[in-house]
Amino acid sequence: GLGTLFMLISIHPTHPQPRQLSMVVDCLQSGGVIAYPTDTIYGLGCSIFKQDAIEKICAIKKVDPEKANLSFICADLSDLSLYAKSIDNSLFRILKKALPGPFTFILPASKEVPKILQSRKKTIGLRIPDNLIALSIIKTLGHPILSASFPGDEVEEYTDPELIQENWGKQIDMVIDGGIGGITPSTVVDCTTDHYEIIRQGAGVWDY
């Protein structure tokens, strides 16, 4: 960890400061685990290319990486299409309408997706949140970050960055304060078959 010195870092929600962003990116590049705001609830994140950090998040969640059905967030649609294989035109149009937004799309994983993140069915959850802090972190880092939920059901604990630091500060390296988060997770849509199926109804209203 980076010690408690850099633990809670405030980033402006509409004008993220480059200096803070580069501190977050340094943390991610050194294999750190962060808590960060999205367009829904706060997430646990790390670089998708740091296997130790992914394993650490799975340990916090008490899940086996193979069974965890992990997701990550991309900067934009061209980034997303690197990590998903076979997105046809009609699905692409839907993604274009729905994103950035509070959805997680389950798609067939391309070979660019690190093995540890692929489910047994070779799928991956992909997300482009409508949150400038999260998107700026990925753009500065240059590749996606994991998007994992905190364990447990006490949703209030995961909306307030200061409470997150109090509860989880010993297990994660940095908490990003981007203001109070939402309490409803993203809507999860399985797009691996012809009939798109809502697996979890969340903040995103599906009318496509």
Give, region by region, the residue ranges found by the protein language model.
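Active-site-adjacent structural elements in enzyme catalytic cores
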Residues: F6-Y208
